[in-house]
Amino acid sequence: MEHQKTHYHSGGIRVLEDLMDSDRLNSLIARTEKPTRFMGGELNMRMKPDAEFKFALCFPDTYEIGMSHLGSRIIYNVLNNREDTFCERAYAPWVDMEALLRENSEKLFSLETKRPLDEFDIIGFSLLYEMCYTNILTMLELSGIPFLSKDRGEDAPLIVAGGPCVCNSEPIADIMDVLFFGDGEELNNDFMDVYASCRHRGLNKHDMLVELSKIEGIYIPSFYEPTYGNDSFASLRKLEPAAPDRIKRRIVHDLDLAEFTGDLVVPYMSIVHDRIALELFRGCTRGCRFCQAGFIYRPVRERRMKTLLDFADKQIKCTGYDEISLFSLSSGDYSEIHEMVPTILDRYKDDRVSVSLPSLRIDSFIKDDLKKIQSVRKTGLTLAPEAGTQRLRDVINKGVNEDDLLRAVGDAFRSGWHGVKLYFMIGLPTETDEDILGIAELARKVSREFYSMPKEMRGKGLRCTVSASTFVPKSFTPFQWEPQISTDEVLRRQALLRSALKGIRGVEFNCHFSETSRLEACFARGDRRLVSVLIGAYKRGARFDSWDEQFKKEAWDEAFMENGLSCEQYANRTIGIDEPLAWQHMDSLISMEYLKREYERSKQGIVTRDCRSGCNGCFGEHCKEYCNMHSSGSEETE
C-alpha cells in the first residue's frame, strides 16, 4: 500500500476552511494563561506551505522551554533549508490549553499554519529528559494518533525522535517508528532524502523502514524484540534481517561544515534562555563519571572563531538580542576563549551586547575574562563543585579542588559579583555523611571569602545559592551500573545538608524533588516493559512530571503495581558488571571496556586525566578513527 496522503482540498474551499479554523483556534488561544505559547507568527518564523513534505517538530514541554533548546532551533532550520520540506513547530500544551482542546473537540496544532498534527507526514519529538515522556502521549492523543507504533496504519504520520534519551529509548521504543542516534544535522538530511525516495517509489511503511534502517544512526525499534529472564532484561532479538546488529551513533566530524542555524525565531514572550547561543564546541574531554553528555558527545570538535563571529553578526542584526551565551559542556576549555570574549565585547560595544559563560569549570575560571564580561553587565555566575570533599570529587573524576573554587569565587567577588550559584549532587557513589557536611563547610568558606572583603566592596551582601540535585545513573557512563539511593535516604541527606547550612551568612539552599529523580533513574535504565507503566500513569492523569506542582505520585505508583513492576527494580539496584544492558544494542562509540575500567578506577578514587593531555582510549580500538588525541600517549593517572 502506498504511504501517501493528500492534506489539501483545492481552491477557495480550503481558504475558507483555514479562516474558520483559525478563528476558532484563536478564540481558544485567547482563553489560555499565556496565549503567546500558541500564537506563532514570531519574527523569523519560516513559512513554506507549498513544500512537498510536512514535518512537525515537537518539543514535549512548554513553549518557553522548547524555544530555548538550541538543538531544536538547529533542526528547524536544517529541515526548512530543504526545498522539499516544511518544518513547523508544536509544543506540549499546558494543562489549560489541553483542557480547552478536549472540551471543544479540537486537535493539537502547529504554530506556523495551525495545521492539526495528524495531517503531517512526519512528527518528530526532541527527547531531552525522561520526565517529558507523558507529554509525548498528551500530544499524540490530542492529535488522534494511537500511542503504539503497531496500532498505527499506513496513512498515519511517521513518528520519529532524537536527542540524548535515545541512548536508552527502550521505555518508549514501542511508541516510536524511527529513532535518531547522534548528531542531527546530517542525519536529518539523510533521513529526508531516503524518506522522499521511498514516498516517490510508493513503498509501504515496512519497506520504507527497511530502507531507513540502512542509514547510520537510524534505529527502527519494531525490527527488534526483547527477551527477559529472572525479572530483568536478557537480550534483544533481531526480527528484520536487513536491520543492523547494533545502531552506531552518528557524528558530525567538522562542525564548521555542518549547518549551524538560520535566523533565530524571536518569541513574543520571555523564554528560559532568551539570548543568542553560540555552540563553541561539541563534546567534553574531562570525563566526569556521572555525566552522560560528557561521554555521548565525544569526540571534542571545535568551531573556528570566524564561524562563530559570522553567525553572531547575523543574529545580532536579525534578532535584536543583546546577550550572547558562549555555550558548551565546558566553555572555558575552548582553545580561543581568551580571544573570543574580548573580541565579542569590542565588536558589539556600541550595541551594549553582553557575554555569558554558563558552563565554566572552576579550574578554567580566569579573572581577566571576568572583568571583561562585567564591563557591559554582570550575567549569572554558576560553578559546579558537585561534591563536598576532595575524596568524593576524585571518585567522580571531577578534577578540581577546594583551592580552585575559593580562588574562582574570590576573583568573582573582587570583580564585582555578589551572587553565585554552587551546584552539588546528593547520592553519588560512595557518598557518606562526611561528604554531605563537606558541602556546608565549602559554602561556609565561600561566605567567609566574600565577607573578608572591605565593606564598601560588598554591596547589598552575598547571595550564594547551594543547589543539590540527586544522582541519577545514566547509560554509557562509568556509573551506569550503580544504584540510586532510596527516596528515604535522599530525604535524610537533604535534611542533613539543610540543617548544616543554617546560619551561614548569605547562603540559601535549593534541592531537587526526590520523587522525580527516582522516576528519572527508573526510565534512564529501563526496558520496554515500562511503556505499559507510562501509558497507565498517563491515563491516571500524569502530565508535566518534571514540574513539581504537576507530579502525581499516586498515578505512577498505581501504574507500576498494575503492571507487576516497581520503580525500585530499575532505579535502586546495582547492575552486575557483566549483566546484559537494555541499551547494549546502541553503539555510542565509547568502548564498554573503557567504561568498566573507569568504574573500577572510581572505586579506588583514581583520577583519570583530561583527554586534552593525552588519549585515555575511550574509543577503544577505534580511537584513531574518531579522535585526534590518540597520538598524545597512553592512559595515565594524575
PLM regions and their residue ranges:
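Glycine-rich beta-alpha loop elements in corrinoid/cobalamin-binding modules
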Residues: 93-238, 475-527, 535-548
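A short beta-strand-loop structural module common to alpha/beta enzyme folds
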Residues: 84-96
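N-terminal [4Fe-4S]-dependent radical SAM core
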Residues: 25-56, 63-64, 221, 227, ...
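Radical SAM enzyme core and accessory elements
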Residues: 1-44, 51, 55-57, 503-638
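N-terminal pre-triad scaffold of radical SAM enzymes
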Residues: 55-61, 76-79, 265-292, 316, ...
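A glycine-rich phosphate-binding loop feature that marks nucleotide/adenosyl-phosphate handling sites
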Residues: 211-222, 329-334, 358-364, 427, ...
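Canonical Radical SAM [4Fe-4S] cluster-binding loop centered on the CxxxCxxC motif
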Residues: 69, 270-306, 617-634
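Conserved SAM/AdoMet-binding glycine-rich loop
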Residues: 57-58, 62, 314-421, 426-465, ...
